[in-house]
Amino acid sequence: MTGFDPKVFVQSLTGAPGVYRMLSAVGEVLYVGKARNLRKRVGSYFARGAHSGKTHAMLQRVAGIEVTVTHTENEALLLEDNLVKSLKPRYNILLRDDKSY
């Protein structure tokens, strides 16, 4: 995964709901998130502004992003939950404890 340009990538995204996976240079899934609007949510990571230390550290390692478009927000929520539980991404601390929604 070389030459990842987040601005170009964000422009190519849809405004539909879905799930995104942030990947390292070796393909490790760093973070899984859901969005009502993929373009706005993923774009928010790369907009100017203050990020928490955890988010800043993660963004330094992002070399690519994969997305799955869903039909509904509920479908995105379920998919995100399943992916976090199965992939156990390093930066998904909040969803790791198997809490039910």
Task: Write out the residue ranges for each language-model feature.
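Acidic, glycine-enriched active-site microenvironments
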Residues: 1-101
